[in-house]
Amino acid sequence: MKELSANTGDKEVHDIDKLDSGITAHGILEVMQDGYGFIRSANYLPGENDVYVSPSQIRRFNLKTGDILEGNTRIKTQQEKFSALLYLSKINEMDPMKAMHRKNFEDMTPIFPNERLSLECGKTSTAMRIMDLMSPIGKGQRGMIVSPPKAGKTTLLKQVALSVQKNNPEVHLLILLIDERPEEVTDIRESIEGPNVEVIYSTFDELPEHHKRVSEMVIERAKRLVEHKKDVMILIDSITRLARAYNLTVPPSGRTLSGGLDPAALHMPKRFFGAARNMREGGSLTILATALVDTGSKMDDVVYEEFKGTGNMELVLDRKLSEKRMFPAIDIPKSSTRREDLLLNKDEQEAVEIMRRALNGMRAEEAVESILNMFSNTKNNNCLLY
């Protein structure tokens, strides 16, 4: 791609070789408002090793925020603070000339999820087997895990990530941890590793602007992958804390919902969550987000109410069950997936209907107890069905 370098104007290829520092830049692109951009490296955030990308290169190769770029940098002069990109060799692991002609994410056609992401794997946890039948996840699902504190939502999210990684290695996993405890970040980073896994985080001691910036980079990264017809899954913990961060950073609109929430603060988290979709042209973006309830904060309940009707899959965790040390603490009657007929086969649909009828009228604890007994007495879901 040397002859297409936009940074060196009309100079010949041999002049480019003189300018080449021999250092390869690799990272995610962030395009600034003024038209130029930077290749970021660690955790999608600004750092001293960032590489400058000129506006002409961005226009020529149709580059957008979230693209992963690879290319050589120019020899840095003493006056320059950042290295500059000399020429591009790859965009999202593809040839730049091919990557230029991709479709825009917004121009693709969203459809209902119709291909299931199987969560059951080997001697898997009961939680994954229950999810597989009672609230299945498809490629392109917009799912929500509704949970009170200490009900095991982070553990559940981790199990989902490990199951998806094992059963669906083609899916690119992006795990976004917002306002999370540092030790949990380390735990997730060490337990979920692989070529298709990225753990991006902003711990609770960071500024709200930091949370906002990280989340925007993650959603842009996911959109760029979907434009290349890849299957992507984002696991976010939690959408409530993301909404809180936006509430502190948006300019006040003059209106306030109960709990002190500015209605303008919900726009970006809704755009984030609403990006999940299955594409008719190929590719999908699945988002599984946790939402906090019963925290004692009115704001958290308002955020949950605002997001309630937007998802097409809901998994509800129950505090009473977790207090009784019944794990997984899933409130089965309240958990479901819309249009699950597209994801389950006939036998599974019949089994789910029988189970739901049997659970109707039971208290949550009794329902979970009877379901747990059913699952623990069988080796896998196939044994349960037949």
Segments and roles (model prediction):
Residues E3-A99:
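N-terminal "pre-motor" subdomain/linker immediately upstream of P-loop NTPase catalytic cores
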Residues K139, A151-G152:
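ATP-binding Walker
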Residues D17-A25, T126-I130, V218-K223, F272:
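Phosphate-interacting basic helix/loop segments used at nucleotide- and nucleic-acid interfaces
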Residues G152, V160-V164, N168-P169, L173-P195, ...:
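P-loop NTPase catalytic core
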Residues I75-I145:
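P-loop NTP-binding catalytic core
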Residues S21-I23, V31-G35, L45-G47, L63-D67, ...:
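Short flexible coil/turn linkers enriched for glycine and charged/polar residues
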